[in-house]
Curated annotation (Swiss-Prot):
List of catalytic residues: H174 (proton donor)
Record-level Gene Ontology MF annotations: galacturan 1,4-alpha-galacturonidase activity; hydrolase activity, hydrolyzing O-glycosyl compounds; metal ion binding; oxidoreductase activity, acting on the CH-OH group of donors, NAD or NADP as acceptor
Effect of C172L: Does not significantly affect alpha-galacturonidase activity
Sites where the protein binds NAD(+): 10-72
Subunit structure: Homotetramer.
GO biological process terms on file: carbohydrate metabolic process
Function: Alpha-galacturonidase able to catalyze the hydrolysis of the chromogenic substrate p-nitrophenyl-alpha-D-galacturonic acid (pNPalphaGalUA), and of the probable natural substrate alpha-1,4-di-galacturonate (GalUA(2)). Can neither hydrolyze pNPbetaGalUA, nor the stereoisomeric pNPalphaGlcUA. Does not display alpha- or beta-glucosidase activity as it fails to hydrolyze melibiose, raffinose, lactose and the chromogenic analogs, pNPalphaGal and pNPbetaGal.
Cofactor(s) needed by this chain: NAD(+); Mn(2+)
Chain segments annotated as transmembrane: none
Stated name of the protein: Alpha-galacturonidase
Catalytic reaction list: [(1->4)-alpha-D-galacturonosyl](n) + H2O = alpha-D-galacturonate + [(1->4)-alpha-D-galacturonosyl](n-1)
Family per record: Belongs to the glycosyl hydrolase 4 family.
Positions annotated to bind Mn(2+): C173, H210
Length: 446
């Protein structure tokens, strides 16, 4: 059970506590949630960044939460009830190699953090980091609940369980939320019914992270799959943009043409953004992103975004201000509240397969809905993936398992086999080996 005696003495350990993204979202959501309070221990390899978040956090909300930068994992984790992990494995310079070095071989990636050459190399960087985190949780906070936001989600979460089998960990991702919003807008357009919240769209979710699928969807007991079939056929060529979004104006937006195309092929609704979906299978998407109306996200954009967030950090500190007190749209705080006994929640999480996805390997990290209540996360039986999707997902699961094992055992040969087996690596073996070695060399130098 948890260490807490009352809901005003909660301890959250934040690994990656210098984050200017996920950590600030948590601060925002905690600042408007009046159900609980306590301490947030901020641990980061960049201690100065954690100290800055301490200052900003302590100016956020009405003082219910005390933020403290700490210098060691032990200090962060000791007596923690909840552990949050959101780190960048390596640096943006490393990610520049992940995403852009394969372009010399004609391999283009829209994100490069999950699969493809970039996802595999990033995974190899992440494995020893997550192994260390898992051991520290085992030693200092074995009863805590762990929420991981770091990509590659499946590999990172798998390593947590491999190193500490008794861990209570879930991986959380917001990609499904965007598909719920798409379905909500479809209901309004096609049926003339306003959907107040995307959560009101009930979905059966299954697959692996960033390659997740919806096989059932409903609103007020209305079956939405036949309606989506018409919707997809109508917008398959032109695309459909969510209200307030324009795919040309943001590297994170799309017109859902990839999702519509995959639905026409496999008969289930892809529940991730087009940028992620496109990387899981070979085909025309990454060769012609503008035709399919999504973007390849350059690392130059991420570096510019980081610079702007650093400026915002300094501004908040000088002005002695905290984060904006508004909901981030993430579900982390609601998950924490449910785990602490403050209600129940059904949402999508990544956990070892215990049979919740019938036709994917047991113990592989799969994404499905789960029922969350006090000190319990129960995956919901979600059935089987369509056969064609199963074949695609199984290949990536094999690669993810190989990357986790290769990283833990330092088996370069196994790592290369996973690299060569990725669907985006459609080049000669000799070229693939040279690319792999060059990317691996960059890891060793970083």
């Amino acid at each position: 059970m948890f260490h807490i005696s009352t809901l005003d003495q909660i301890k959250i350990a934040y690994i990656g506590g210098g984050s200017q993204g996920w950590a600030r979202s948590l601060m925002s959501d905690l600042s408007i949630d009046e159900r609980m309070s306590g301490t947030v221990a901020l641990y980061d390899l960049d201690f100065e960044a954690a100290q800055k978040n301490e200052v900003i956090g302590n100016h956020s909300g009405n003082g219910r939460w005390r933020y403290e930068a700490v210098s060691t994992l032990k200090k962060a984790l000791s007596a923690a009830d909840i552990v949050i992990i959101s780190i960048l494995p390596g640096s943006l310079d490393d990610m520049e190699v992940d995403v852009h070095l394969p372009e010399r071989c004609g391999i283009y990636q829209s994100v490069g953090d999950t699969v493809g050459p970039g996802g595999i190399i990033r995974g190899l960087r992440a494995v020893p980091i997550f192994a260390e985190i898992a051991r520290a949780i085992r030693d200092y906070a074995p009863e805590s609940w762990v929420i991981n936001y770091t990509n590659p989600m499946s590999v990172c979460t798998r390593v947590l369980y491999k190193v500490f089998p008794g861990i209570k960990a879930i991986g959380c991702c917001h990609e499904v939320f965007g598909t719920q919003k798409l379905l909500a807008e479809m209901v309004t357009e096609r049926l003339g019914i306003e959907v107040p919240r995307r959560e009101d769209i009930r979905v059966n979710v299954l697959g692996i992270n960033h390659f997740t699928w919806i096989t059932k969807a409903s609103y007020r007991h209305i079956d939405l799959l036949p309606i989506f079939r018409e919707f997809s056929a109508h917008y398959g060529e032109s695309g459909y943009e969510l209200e307030g979004e324009c795919w040309r104006d943001s590297v994170f937006c799309s017109a859902h043409r990839v999702a519509f195309d995959l639905f026409e092929t496999y008969g289930a609704i892809p529940a991730a953004g087009d940028r992620h979906l496109a990387e899981f299978l070979p085909g025309p998407y990454l060769k012609q992103p503008e035709v399919w109306k999504f973007h390849l996200t350059p690392i130059s954009f991420r570096k510019q975004d980081r610079a702007e967030k650093r400026q915002e950090t300094e501004r908040l500190i000088v002005q002695q201000r905290g984060v904006a007190e508004k909901a981030s749209g993430e579900e982390g705080v609601n998950i924490i509240a449910a785990l602490l006994g403050l209600g129940e929640l059904v949402t999508n999480v990544n956990m070892p397969n215990q049979g919740q996805v019938l036709n994917l390997p047991i113990q592989a990290i799969v994404e499905t809905n789960a029922f969350i209540t006090r000190n319990r996360v129960q995956p919901i039986l979600s059935g089987a993936l369509p056969k064609g999707v199963e074949m695609l997902a199984a290949r990536h699961i094999s690669n993810q398992e190989a990357v986790a094992d290769a990283g833990l055992t330092k088996d370069t040969g196994l790592a290369f086999q996973a690299f060569l087996n990725d669907p985006l690596v459609q080049i000669d073996r000799s070229d693939a080996e040279q690319l792999f070695n060059d990317m691996l060399q960059c890891i060793m130098q970083s």
